[in-house]
């Protein structure tokens, strides 16, 4: 097993799925930067992490080092230094397309961008991305912090 180059994860959306991703990433010792326009998102995510932590501990799924959780004011701030971006906004096509457009404008051009979409075509989400080949579907099973995810690579892609 090799060490991952991913140290900092940006999460766009802090609802059930985003909070679950935050918990999973923190349990694996990653730095997490989360953005969500809803004022209650911060408390929601912090509560989710606190509630899930004993479950992860009992299951032996915590790394030696707990990651750090930070909150950003907007997408640009959240993704600017991220090594991986996971989008978790509501399942509305135009919203997701717009969010992916903004992410692609501010994330490094070598960063993979995943969407938690459960039913939208990746090719549609790529429509306005600066680097459409970076986008993939990374849809989690519930609870996100315990179960593996379904990954779907979209077209076109480019090797890294």
Where are these regions (language model features)?
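Rossmann-fold NAD(P)-binding glycine/threonine-rich loop
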Residues: 98-146
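Acidic/polar active-site rim loop that often engages polyanionic ligands
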Residues: 28-30, 143-151
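Rossmann-like NAD(P)-binding element
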Residues: 37-44, 54-112
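NAD(P)+-binding Rossmann beta1-loop-alpha1 motif at the extreme N-terminus of oxidoreductases
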Residues: 1-55
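Structural motif
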Residues: 12, 72, 88, 115-117, ...
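Hydrophobic/aromatic beta-strand patches that form the interior of the parallel beta-sheet core
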Residues: 33, 86, 136-138
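Single conserved hydrophobic/aromatic residue that forms the stacking wall/gate
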Residues: 151-160
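Short glycine/serine/threonine-rich phosphate/pyrophosphate-binding segments
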Residues: 18-21, 94, 118-122
């Amino acid at each position: 097993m090799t060490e991952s180059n991913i140290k900092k994860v940006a999460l766009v959306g802090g609802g059930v799925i985003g909070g679950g991703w935050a918990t999973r990433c923190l349990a694996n010792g990653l730095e997490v930067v989360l953005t969500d326009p809803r004022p209650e998102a911060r408390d929601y995510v912090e509560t989710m992490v606190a509630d899930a932590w004993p479950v992860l501990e009992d299951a032996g799924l915590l790394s030696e080092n707990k990651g750090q959780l930070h909150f950003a004011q907007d997408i640009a701030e959240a993704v600017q230094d991220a090594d991986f971006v996971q989008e978790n906004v509501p399942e509305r096509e135009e919203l997701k397309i717009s969010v992916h457009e903004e992410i692609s404008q501010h994330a490094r051009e070598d960063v993979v961008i995943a969407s938690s979409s459960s039913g939208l075509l990746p090719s549609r989400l790529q429509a306005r991305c600066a680097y459409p080949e970076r986008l993939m579907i990374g849809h989690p099973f519930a609870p996100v912090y315990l179960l593996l995810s379904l990954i779907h690579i979209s077209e076109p892609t480019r090797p890294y």
